[in-house]
Amino acid sequence: MKIARHKVNRLSRLTRIFFGGLVIFLVFWSGWAQQPPSSPLGPLSARTGLLLKDSVIIRLIQASSGDLAFDTVSHLALWHRLQTSESYTRAAEWISQKARDIGLEQVGIERFPADGTIEYFGNTMPPQWKVMKAELWLTSPFSMKLTSYAELPLSLAMHSTSADVEAELVDIGAGIDDKDYTASVKGKIVLTTSNALRIYDRAVAKEGAAGIVSSWSVPDFDSLNRRPADFPDQVGWQRIPGKGVEGPSHFAFGLSARRAQELQSLIRQGKTVRVHAIVEAKLVPGNLEVVSGTIPGSAYPNEEIVVTAHLDHYKPGANDNASGSASILEMARTMRQLIENKEMPPPLRTIRFMWVPEYNGTYAWLSKHLNDPVKRLADLNFDMVGENVVKTNSVISVCYTSDSNPSFLNAVMESILDFVNRFNDDRYPAQTDFYIGSLNGTRNRAAWRMIPFVSGTDHDLFNRLRIGAASLGAWPDDFYHSSEDSPDKVDPTQLHRAVVLGLAAIDTLAYADSEQAQDFAQLSLVYGRQRIAHSEFSASRSLLSATKNGFHEADHLAGNLMAHVFSRERAAISSAVMLARTPKARSDVQRVVSWLDGDEAASRKKVEDIARLRAGELGLTRSPLPLTEADKRAARLIPIWNEGKELFSFEYVQRILAQDSSAQIPKIKAALDEVSQRLRDRGVDELTLYGFQDAAALYVDGKRSIPDIRDALAAEYTSIAVEALELYFRAFEKAGLMKILDK
């Protein structure tokens, strides 16, 4: 019995030890299991070139879907999503419900009045255009329905209002020259190949035409990429004037080139062609509606990464811009899923997703939120991102921030773009873990590129506020702003790649903490050196090609360019300081900035050597360009924005001062047009030139003098006379937007 009791006691002790150890193990295991996932960021990856860990980018690829995004595109393409319209409201409500369903927080639709007179930052907001019915019929020499709003909403020009007119159809060709109106068009409906808006004042307001039928579909700025004959069944998206909710009845219809040619043939045969236009539509007060939702930041909730896409446009508007709207919804869904499944921690910063009416909605939203107690670190914009590039003749690109707003964001975006290209440039890549495709998509190769800053979409406004802002988009697109911008031109694979780029950028920015500030600075240094090398090449080439008469200017501009790009890249690296929260982290960033000092000395020496070589070949002595009296006067002048006016544009200045001859607006416009033409002659594309008239204003920071701004423009674009710039800024001052300090 004693032995038995001893064995029992021993077993009891062993049991207690076992279960005690098990409890301790379970406690530790439970604690380990409940640890939140680690930061997605790490040191620069040798495989991917990203600041994201390899395992994270793989998970982002696998968790996201281009096919789900494509389904969203197909749904949005069912609505004629014009700004302030009832169909836009339905699309906004649908998106907001989807945002709630996937778990975004603070989801809501903000409404801003718009009636054709209300302005935000000097931009007049359009009224609601309410269409009940619109049809265009051929009534002679036979009866046939030519088009209808119900079947093709885009065929009725925006802002057309109620009319019931049966009249003779007369062909006026382009409708621009006097010869097009040798025969009276009063009371008749004119057939034209021009944009209805372009000829409206002449044909309707002056000559008395009852209405317009237009076969136009190719914007002037896209004429290098397509011609009307290339797509004979394409109907272009058009509008006519419609400033307020009251005014005379007027209308315009759009037809395809093929249908218009049929009508022209009847007219040439000498037959009397009559058409019947029936329009029930009116302009009424409406609202701009902005949908937004957030993933709140866990550590720095008052710092935001803003992700934007414009929700509006014509039906179908698949690539422009159901694709961008669908892409950011898929980014939000993927982020919420990974956080909810504890595969990723909550972001340190708040991520705000916004679906907006392009430009106007962002202007309106900023009018309310510009002074919110939050720090907006970046805007990532997605506009026309789903193109099947083979079908649409497109190139996918990411634009740098403007040189007036240098940012580490450029290096972040370029590193992700390089990653996408590297692992998606073959149809059947060897490294499939980094391949981004879709079940129902193509195997088109990725050949994305970085391009100079362009405006034309919503990132432009954040850039003006000196927030790092980049935009992903496709250009050209053969179906842009036409009836053929349909879901069959959208590629789920391309959507998936856009989503992954967005997720990678969002995560890199939203999870960065103070200890990563130096990593961002170093990444900016690497990519900045690449851009500097390109500028060094450009400066050297311009010197070697300089003629005797043009050498001194080329020498000056080459030196100016090198000074500019080093200043830009120092500022881009320095911008990483916004992530630094300790003196050491800030010091680490500035140490990286200093590494450019040696680079600049070496780079300038190489350019100087080439300048001396070329001067010798031409038999010239190098000398600086002499300062003119205008230079000396302007050097004392420093433009400063008046508070809250930074988003006002030169277009507003022109409108406000149109009747003020002392502002010399025609002279300023002529100077800007001359510079734009020189850039075109150099092969600069229209997308880059879009918004150029505001480029000088972007450099206004209260520190730069007018010659400083001239020099910056010369480096980023081309030279402009300092006298023209002084007039330009005087006009801004006269319009109440700036003041000019005379130091």
Give the predicted meaning of each segment.
Residues 239-242, 252-253, 260-261, 300, ...:
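Metal-dependent peptidase/peptidase-like ectodomains
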Residues 148-180, 237-320, 330-346, 350:
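Soluble metallo-hydrolase cores and metallopeptidase-like ectodomains found primarily
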Residues 688-743:
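Long, charge-rich, low-complexity alpha-helical segments
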Residues 74, 84-86, 147-244, 249-251, ...:
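Extracellular/luminal Protease-associated
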Residues 19-29:
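Bacterial N-terminal signal peptides
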Residues 71, 334-364, 372, 382:
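Short helix-loop-beta-strand segments that form the rim/entrance of peptidase-like active sites
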Residues 56-63, 77-87, 171, 189-195, ...:
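Second-shell loop/turn segments in exported
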Residues 35-52, 62, 66, 74-186:
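Noncatalytic luminal/extracellular "stalk/propeptide" segments of secretory-pathway proteins
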